Structures are given as structure tokens and as C-alpha cells.
Amino acid sequence: VHIDIAVIAAPAADSFGNANGLSGDSACGLLGFALADSEYADRVIVVTDNVVPFPCVPWQIQGNNVDMVVAIDSLGDPSKIVSGTTQITNSPDRLLIAEYVSSFVEQSGIMRNGFSFQAGAGGISLAVIKFLRDRMKERGIKARFVRGGSTKHLVSLLEEGLTDYVLDGQLFDQDSVRSMRDNPRHVSTSPFTSYNYHGKGNFASMLDFVVLGATEIDLNFNANVVTHSDGYLLHGIGGWQDCLFSKCTILAVPSFRDRIPVIVDDVTTLCGPGELIDVVVTERGIAINPR
């Protein structure tokens, strides 16, 4: 896709165009998803409400690629980063699913010193982090790295010494913003290094397991994450497909949502082929892909 103009909102920038998301009243964390736009667009405009003296470091966007810096009064309210989908679930069924996942990870031997994982920012995934944290503390196990998007639950693993590093591509609350700003072991990454299938530094395949959601899963372990059974588009896929290249891909879903089955004969929209899905966990139990 040829990009004519890229407009990048940056919570901090200098007059040369070096920019980051770590400081200022609008701090949101990191700008990794805008990196490709800044490098490939014909014209790049950085918009900021916080012009700082050169150099603005660390520079997540390099001024060498920026044509213009525009100062405005306010970029927005960073507290709105948090949404209802980035809260730990209160549902007994979903908490049971999370408990099953953490138990599987422990009993299968995946949870060991030096392991790595990614859990998303949905309610079940956040509960998995909580339960996994308890099991790691009980057994004295420390991860080498965990992969964000981060919330305070992932940050707690770093601050409690349960992981050496958090490698992050997206932040979902102000605790994560603070952590990345203040803790050198909370590292910002870009899609080039984390999820680019063609990138030599792609570390998605280094993850020992990932926990993901889905809108539908069929009997052949194929998964849909972008539509419901009515076929209407819900949202973008994001990095979901790239996560499937982990060593163990776990889909944690309820059997039903609003009385509509999540486990179906055939998915409405194929987003992830069954050959890349290893485990499906619902409140009714654990299904392991025989392939």
C-alpha cells in the first residue's frame, strides 16, 4: 500500500521530529505501530502537544523520516486507553477457563525457568496471567521474557521479579506507561521485530505459548477472530495471526456467548488454520489438537 501522508500523534517530540509516547500529559507508551508509516510514507507529519528541546529520547520515531512537526494544545485523554475489554473477567465460567489454561501450562511442563509467553489483554487472558503468577511464585519459577500488550497485570510480573523482561508492542493502561518509562527492562518493540513474518528478528516463534481468544472455533480447530456467525466484520485482526507461530497456541473461549455457540461445525470466516491451533480450552474442558 502506497502511503502519501502519515500523520503521527506523539505525546513528546522535538523540533527535528524525533518522538516518543513516554512523556508529557498525553503519554500513551510507545509508537511502534506508526514506525512503518514514518519510514514509508511520502510525507510524515508529527503532531504533538509537548515540544521538548532536542534530543527527544528515546526516539521511537526518528526525526530523519519526519517532514513537519505541528504543535497543538492537546492530543487527548490518555486515561481513555483503558476499555472494558482490558479488565480481568468476573465471570465464574471464564475464571474457570483461565484456571484450566494455567493448570495446563504447568502440568504440561511449559512453565519452567526461562520460558516465555504472551497473553492478550482480554478478560480471560488477564485472568490467566493472574493464575499463572500465583503458580510461578509458588514454584519459584521465573520467565525469561513475556510479550505485551501490557496491562498492570503483566507489569506486576516484572516488578515482582517473575520475568527478566517485558517486550512490548502496545500498552493498555497508565501502569504500563509508567513501567516502560521508568524500567529499562520494559522494552518497546515494533512490528518489524515482533510480528513481521519476513523479518529476521521476528520472535513470535520463540514464544513457548500464547493465549488468544476467538469468536468461533470449528471441529477441525480452525478459528475465526474477525466476525461472528452473521458474517459482519467486528474489528481488525491485529497480531492474532502472527501469534499462531508460537510453540503452543492456546485458544481460551467460552462454549457460548449470548446463547450463540462458539464451537461450530465450520467457522464463518477462516482467520487461523487448524494446523496452527494446538489447544482449545472452554469451561467444559481442554481439547488438544490430535495433529
Language model feature labels by segment:
Residues 148:
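Active-site histidine-anchored catalytic micro-motif
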Residues 120-126:
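Core structural elements
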Residues 1-116, 127-136, 143-144, 153-291:
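Conserved phosphate- and dinucleotide-binding cores of soluble alpha/beta proteins
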